[in-house]
Amino acid sequence: MKTIYSTLALLVVIATSLHAQDTATHQSNAGIKGGYNLSAVSFDGDGETGQRHGFHIGVYGESFISESFSIQPELLYSQQGYEIKDANGTFTQKLDYINLPILLKAYPSKNFYLEAGPQIGLAISHKEEYNGLFSSSQEYDPNNFDWGMNFGGGFKTGSGITLGVRYHLGLGDLYDQGKAHNRVWQFSVGFDL
């Protein structure tokens, strides 16, 4: 009889342990991420420009503040900018940023998350290219500081691999004259370290 009770107790302990592993809470972590950028600029009154293709790469740290919520600061290098095409040629504004987003992440389920939060950015380089019939001597000098909001979501595996999509809604003026704001779609892959 003692053997039966001991065996039952052992089975209960094993079953509880397996269940706890299956429903384990999220753990704070750090990692690297990178991916594809699709960026444009919204000019007030003139609509949105053509898109520039680029990439982003950087590091993140995720700290859980409850079972379903975390805060994730990131430090990213990001290629942004825009393109304008007309009958005479193509103008491309290439802007490279160091961005610092701070995101609140919500996990409605174990693997899916939604995120939102502010971002500040510092332009570290800019370059203008004009390919067409006539060359342009006009200089565009963008502001060095950018800020805005990010919104996104994604999927995170139990092994720490993340697939995410994010939209950056720039709120800072890109140029001193006129209203122009960054708009960036980011498609990312991240790896917890």
Model-based region annotation:
Residues S68-I71, F112-L114, S159-V165:
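Repeated loop/turn-to-beta-strand initiation elements of outer-membrane beta-barrel proteins
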Residues S42-E48, E83-T90, H126-L133, L174-H181:
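Outer-membrane beta-barrel translocator domains and adjoining extracellular loop/strand segments
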Residues N37, G152-I161, H181-L193:
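Outer-membrane beta-barrel "beta-signal"
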Residues T25, S66, Y107-S109, G158:
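Outer-membrane beta-barrel channels and translocator barrels
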Residues M1-H26:
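Cleavable N-terminal export/targeting peptides
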Residues G58-Y60, P101-L103, G152, S188-G190:
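Outer-membrane beta-barrel architecture
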Residues H26-S28, T49-F55, K94-I98, N143-M149, ...:
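Residues that define the transmembrane beta-barrel architecture of outer-membrane proteins
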